[in-house]
């Protein structure tokens, strides 16, 4: 999606190129490239099981990555940041349909609270940097994404890749029953990754502030 816009240069580092938890390595990498536009998509992401098992890591690593990337972008003179948020920032107390102004209503759900608080903190940081430094941003509140190159892992993956992994493992083992949490009635909004990428590009061109990034269609998990 980005390459279709024919940018003069595109730098998409992997973890092997730069550990974003390392402050100085992150600042150095961003300073060396001196980007005009920064898409901040990095984070320590897990499914329900991983979020419950690694609460400290979820908060520390996400908060540290966000601090390093946003400050590094400011130091390097970036003109704008487009950052990936999450619907986990919303509380169960938020009215439906959820609106961007409701992000601070009540605490996040306990199952994802550390991860969600780190993501809320990034929004607060971006707002503070816009106020003090005049750094524009778009904060994309992403729903459940799925698509190529996902993490097909029952601990670290989201709903769709976790279920695919579980079905595949069960089939490979020759088992006849699949054990899933709950009764499948909870609903989620699932968004294809390429559609999310297109929304990010649109936000980079003209967006300011927080945006819910979703289809607007709720689907029961069992479907």
For every predicted segment, state its role.
Residues 12, 23-63, 75:
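NAD(P)H-binding glycine-rich loop region in Rossmannoid oxidoreductase-like domains
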Residues 13, 38-44, 81-87, 140-142:
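SDR active-site strand-loop-helix element
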Residues 19, 89-91, 114, 138-162, ...:
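Flexible, glycine-rich beta-alpha linker
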Residues 48, 83-99, 114-120, 132, ...:
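Conserved catalytic-site region of short-chain dehydrogenase/reductase
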Residues 59-63, 107, 111-123, 153-161, ...:
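Short-chain dehydrogenase/reductase
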Residues 67-112, 138:
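Conserved Rossmann-fold NAD(P)-dependent oxidoreductase catalytic core, especially the SDR/UDP-sugar
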Residues 68, 92, 110-143, 162-173:
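Active-site Tyr-X1-5-Lys
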Residues 131, 145-148, 160-178, 188-212:
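Alpha-helical substrate-binding/gating segment
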């Amino acid at each position: 999606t980005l390459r279709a816009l024919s940018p003069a240069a595109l730098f998409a580092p992997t973890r092997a190129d730069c550990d974003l938890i390392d402050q100085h390595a992150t600042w150095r990498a961003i300073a060396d490239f001196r980007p005009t536009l920064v898409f901040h998509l990095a984070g320590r992401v897990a499914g329900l099981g991983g979020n419950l098992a690694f609460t400290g890591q979820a908060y520390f690593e996400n908060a540290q990555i966000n601090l390093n990337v946003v400050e590094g972008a400011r130091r390097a003179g970036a003109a704008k940041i487009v950052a990936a948020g999450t619907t986990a920032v919303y509380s169960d107390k938020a009215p439906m349909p959820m609106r961007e102004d409701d992000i601070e209503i009540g605490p996040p759900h306990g199952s994802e609270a550390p991860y969600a608080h780190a993501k809320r903190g990034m929004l607060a940081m971006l707002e503070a940097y816009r106020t003090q430094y005049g750094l524009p941003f778009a904060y994309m509140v992403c729903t459940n994404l799925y698509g190529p190159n996902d993490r097909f892992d029952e601990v670290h993956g989201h709903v769709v890749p976790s279920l695919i992994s579980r079905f595949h493992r069960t089939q490979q083992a020759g088992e006849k029953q699949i054990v899933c949490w709950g009764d499948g009635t909870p609903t989620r909004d699932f968004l294809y990754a390429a559609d999310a990428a297109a929304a990010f590009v649109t936000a980079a061109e003209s967006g300011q502030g927080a945006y819910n990034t979703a289809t607007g269609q709720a689907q029961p998990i069992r479907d």
